[in-house]
C-alpha cells in the first residue's frame, strides 16, 4: 500500500470515527473468509461498517478523531456505526456465532473506552425500531381495549334485542 493510499485511508476512517456512536475492536484470528463475509453481511444489513485495518493506521485515525487511545495488537477487525447499540449487537452476535475465532477486545462509546460489561449490556438493548414498536404497542393498547369493549357492548345489546 502506498503512502498516499494510507493517508487517504486514515483520513476516511478519521472522518467516519468522528461521527461514530460506537467503535468495537474485535480479534478475528483463525476465521475463514466465509465467516468474515457473514459478519460483514450482518453489518451491511444494519447500516454499520466492518473493516480489517492495519493497527498503526487505525490508531492514527482514532487519535485524529479525538478518541481515547486503544492498544492495537494482533489481528483486528473494527466495527463502527452512527448508533451506539448496533455495532455492539453485531459484535456480540458474531462473538456468539463464532465463539472459537471471534472475540471482542475493546470498544469506544462516544470516543471513550467502554468496559466489556457496557458493551455486552448495550448489545442486549433493543434497537431504535424495536423501541418505537414497543411504544406504539403501549399507545395502541388502551384504544384497542376500548374498541373491544364497545364491540362487546354492541354484541350484548344486539343479542338482547
From Swiss-Prot:
CDD domains: Ribosomal_L10. Gene3D superfamilies: 3.30.70.1730, 6.10.250.290. InterPro entries: Ribosomal_uL10, Ribosomal_uL10-like_sf, Ribosomal_uL10_bac, Ribosomal_uL10_bac_type. Disulfide bonds: none annotated. It comes from the Bacteria. Pfam families: Ribosomal_L10. GO terms for cellular component: ribonucleoprotein complex; ribosome. SUPFAM superfamilies: Ribosomal protein L10-like (SSF160369). One of its GO terms (biological process) is translation. One of its GO terms (molecular function) is large ribosomal subunit rRNA binding. Coiled coil: none annotated. Keywords: Ribonucleoprotein, Ribosomal protein, RNA-binding, rRNA-binding. Signal peptide: none annotated. Part of the ribosomal stalk of the 50S ribosomal subunit. The N-terminus interacts with L11 and the large rRNA to form the base of the stalk. The C-terminus forms an elongated spine to which L12 dimers bind in a sequential fashion forming a multimeric L10(L12)X complex. Forms part of the ribosomal stalk, playing a central role in the interaction of the ribosome with GTP-bound translation factors. PANTHER family: 39S RIBOSOMAL PROTEIN L10, MITOCHONDRIAL. Belongs to the universal ribosomal protein uL10 family. This is Large ribosomal subunit protein uL10. It comes from Sulfurovum sp. (strain NBC37-1). The lineage of its organism: Bacteria, Pseudomonadati, Campylobacterota, Epsilonproteobacteria, Campylobacterales.
